[in-house]
A protein has these predicted regions:
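A short, well-ordered alpha-helix in the C-terminal region of glycosyltransferases
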Residues: 353, 360-374
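A conserved, positively charged/aromatic
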Residues: 87, 110, 114-146
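N-terminal strand-loop element at the rim of the active site
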Residues: 12-20, 24-74
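Aromatic "clamp/platform" in nucleotide-sugar-dependent glycosyltransferases that forms part
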Residues: 255, 274
Length: 393
């Protein structure tokens, strides 16, 4: 094979492949790229793999996380050294990393022709030392939302930053939503309307706001239920639901390897996060034509739910966006008392209005699928492949 026709070699780097948004993106990226490129995934640990990696080349560096500042520092250099050796052995053209620890290790490697790093959370870009490190040592820094890329360019003056939306397997989601064998859907099999939210037990998800807003929705519309799908015990949230008098209307469903049959049977998606990068769950809801009410947090909801994201982001009141309803951002202080805050009332009012307005509800249902296509894996692949080709001419 002539050199001009040689398949380029791509190394994807992720800390692990367990439950997590960027790990899922890493695996999906590998499957998309392997059609045109030789792809290898390097991970620091192969423990607790949650994704299908059959048919993919995965190398376990066996350098999992360690406790203590000294051990963590040593780990950074051990990982970078091992990755550099591997890049040289495999003659890697482009290394592309996901997550903070992988980005740091990748930035410090010297074995690939080009280096790409990816930021997937708003909290990540607030770390100035980290951002300076990866920007100075990367050929391109991807941010998963336009708002994040905008902030990085403005706050740090970096010019090698590009927005690259997370890929969503639209057809796969729709197909999986029809595979309900073995799933317990009894909570959904009533005449009640089911409101749903997804996310692990983490303060950044703002689930106390969700429960209090739902209490108000249920007061107005007693035929409503709430399901929270995600990993965690949710002990303090179950206690809050008891104090709010809604425990019999709320299901903490736990982690679901296939959450899509549950989304498919739901009536409304709610998001109450304090911050996001680009919330994949909103795109997944759109893919299943599920109407959305989301707080207008940094970042992601505004640009998912409205064409002119800058216009939507600037709104300080309830806003009926192109593809869903945005409500004011919630307060970051964790308040586990039963008193209601203004933003919770606004979220509850918007959700109640949408559920009670068949014309508005149907308009969002019809618009959802076309918007989800903008976040398809095909769109992601085209943009990523274009970047790789540009950098490796």
């Amino acid at each position: 094979m002539g050199k001009a026709n040689k398949r380029k070699k791509i190394m994807l780097i992720s800390p692990m492949l367990h439950q997590g948004g960027f790990e899922r993106i890493c695996v999906m990226t590998a499957r998309l790229l392997q059609k045109e490129y030789d792809v290898v995934i390097a991970v620091f640990s192969l423990e607790d793999v949650a994704y299908d990696i059959s048919g993919l080349q995965v190398i376990d560096l066996k350098l999992k996380a360690r406790k203590g500042k000294l051990n963590k520092g040593i780990n950074v250099f051990r990982r970078s050294y091992r990755l550099t050796r591997l890049q040289r052995e495999l003659d890697i053209d482009v290394s592309y990393s996901f997550g903070m620890t992988a980005n740091i290790a990748n930035a410090l490697t010297t074995g690939a022709r080009r280096k790409l790093t990816a930021c997937h959370s708003f909290e990540e870009i607030k770390d100035a030392v980290y951002m300076k490190l990866i920007s100075r040592h990367s050929d391109r820094v991807f941010c998963c939302s336009k708002k994040m890329a905008d902030l990085v360019q403005k706050d740090y003056g970096f010019t090698n930053v590009q927005a690259l939306w997370n890929p969503c397997d639209i057809e796969g989601i729709q197909k999986q939503s029809r595979v309900a064998e073995g799933e317990d859907l009894s909570f959904w099999e009533t005449e009640d309307k089911v409101l749903v939210s997804m996310g692990r037990e983490d303060d950044v998800k703002g689930f106390w706001h969700l429960l209090k807003a739902f209490r108000r929705i249920n007061e107005k519309m007693p035929d409503t239920r709430l399901a929270i799908i995600g990993d965690g015990e949710f002990r303090e949230y179950k206690e809050l639901a008891q104090r709010l008098g809604i425990a019999d209307r709320v299901l903490f469903a736990g982690l679901k390897r296939n959450p899509f049959p549950y989304l498919q049977k739901s009536d409304l998606y709610l998001l109450t996060s304090l911050s996001e990068g680009l919330p994949n769950a909103l795109v997944e809801a759109l893919a299943l034509s599920l109407p959305i009410v989301s707080v207008n947090c940094l970042s992601g909801p505004a640009e998912i739910l409205h064409e002119n994201w800058r216009e939507a982001e600037a709104k300080k009141e309830v806003f009926e966006a192109d593809y869903g309803i945005l409500t004011p951002a919630v307060k970051p202080v964790k308040n586990m008392q039963t008193d209601m805050e203004e933003e919770e009332e606004q979220l509850a009012s918007a959700a109640s209005k949408l559920l009670g307005d068949p014309e508005l509800y149907e308009s969002y249902q019809k618009a959802a699928a076309s918007r989800a296509a903008d976040f398809s894996k095909e769109t992601y692949y085209r943009e990523l492949a274009s970047c790789i080709e540009e950098m490796t001419k």
